[in-house]
Amino acid sequence: MTILHTALALVPLALYLGAATLVVRAVRADPTARPLSAVVVAQAGVLVHAALLFRAIDSPGGVTIAITDSASLVGWVIGATTAIALGFTALGALSSVLLVLAGLLATLTGLLGGLSEVDVPHWELTAHIALAALAAGWLTIAVTAVLLLSWQDARVRARKPMGSLALLPPMETMERTLFQAIGGGFVVLTLALVTGLFFVHDLIAQHLAHKVASHSQSGSEKV
């Protein structure tokens, strides 16, 4: 990983952090704020993140992806989902937390290039990986919402000062976001499993066809 690549990997992190900061500033003044500036900066981060990912995994034979690239892809899903949601729903500090998480995962892009890469020659496997990353991203959003919601609920029950938790959206919004992320995540995860089964079935069929062809060829040579 070159110094230039390292520097480029920090660009989406900087953009995501910038968007998160803009959200926090806006929410301090108005809890229902949906700052356009944060949406624009977050979307810029998503675009740069996508460009870096494409550069890292694109290869002449199709797609070559490392473990760190998979994690970065999950981060891209989190960042893209949050950037879109920012324009429609006041998620408060929840969106800031998710953007920071997306930025941290973006720094993993190409980190282990050449060391743990796996070639993905078949479109079925590419679709499976993409759907799995989408499901993982949405389920990560759900887990983040659960943790923050639990912390928020514990503070309310203990009647302690909310502190920075006051910047989170109302519990109803948190719960709705949680269930939407879980529902979408499991639907996409089911699709990922289906595409995985298709790929395995196709792989087995190809293996059997190759085995039969090899057996027939060896039989012909004996005759």
Question: Where are each of the predicted segments found?
Answer:
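A mid-sequence, solvent-exposed acidic-amphipathic segment
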Residues: 155-199
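N-terminal signal-anchor/start-transfer transmembrane helix
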Residues: 9-30
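Transmembrane alpha-helix/helix-exit interface in multi-pass inner-membrane proteins
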Residues: 134-159
